[in-house]
């Protein structure tokens, strides 16, 4: 056990926080849930219609599925369904299941576009775009989201806040 070498996290979260270290998965999972809630508040506070304020569940093939983000953009009237992910590096079976969920939930909602939203990356790296686009799935980052909602902050302020305010709190928690 002494010789086990911890692996560096592949989550974009650490990059967004300006940290380069090993991570505690439970802290990252909780962070992911909280940042999802944050972006739903941003959408609700914008001119776009947040379609999950009352209910974030939809029935798909007899099962209840959680909706991370669903909104009608005030700029283009497009109905978006977004699955929030801070990490796009999951195994091939999970990729297939997650991609399938996006398609099924998008169809159940009658959304125009179903995609991943990575709330800890400004723009999605080309390798990830290619990987997911080749499977017929779009992936968006913060810069894209801020182009669709009239947030009360700009991208630089968001990432500065993550690094300077959120990161020290998570470090104190053990990240």
Where are these regions (language model features)?
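An acidic- and aromatic-residue-enriched active-site/binding cleft used to recognize and process polar
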Residues: 56, 85-87, 120
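Short, well-structured beta-strand/strand-turn elements
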Residues: 46-59
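Well-ordered, non-membrane alpha-helical segments in soluble/globular domains
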Residues: 95-103
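Short beta-strand-loop-alpha-helix junction that forms the active-site gateway
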Residues: 84-95
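Hydrophobic beta-strand segments of well-ordered beta-sheets in folded domains
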Residues: 78-81, 110-121
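Active-site beta-strand-loop-beta-strand hairpin of nuclease catalytic cores
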Residues: 64-82
């Amino acid at each position: 056990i002494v010789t086990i070498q911890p692996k560096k996290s592949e989550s974009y979260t650490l990059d967004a926080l300006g940290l380069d270290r090993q991570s505690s998965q439970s802290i990252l999972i909780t962070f992911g849930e909280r940042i999802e809630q944050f972006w739903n508040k941003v959408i609700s506070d914008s001119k776009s219609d947040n379609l999950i304020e009352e209910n974030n569940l939809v029935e798909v093939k007899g099962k209840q599925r959680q909706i991370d983000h669903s909104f009608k953009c005030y700029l283009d009237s497009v109905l978006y369904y977004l699955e929030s992910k801070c990490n796009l590096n999951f195994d091939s079976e999970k990729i297939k299941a997650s991609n399938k969920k996006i398609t099924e939930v998008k169809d159940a909602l009658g959304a125009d576009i179903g995609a991943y939203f990575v709330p800890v990356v400004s723009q999605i790296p080309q390798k990830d775009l290619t990987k997911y686009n080749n499977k017929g799935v779009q992936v968006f980052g913060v810069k894209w989201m801020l182009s669709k909602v009239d947030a009360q902050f700009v991208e630089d302020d968001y990432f500065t806040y993550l690094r300077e305010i959120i990161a020290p709190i998570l470090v104190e928690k053990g990240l």
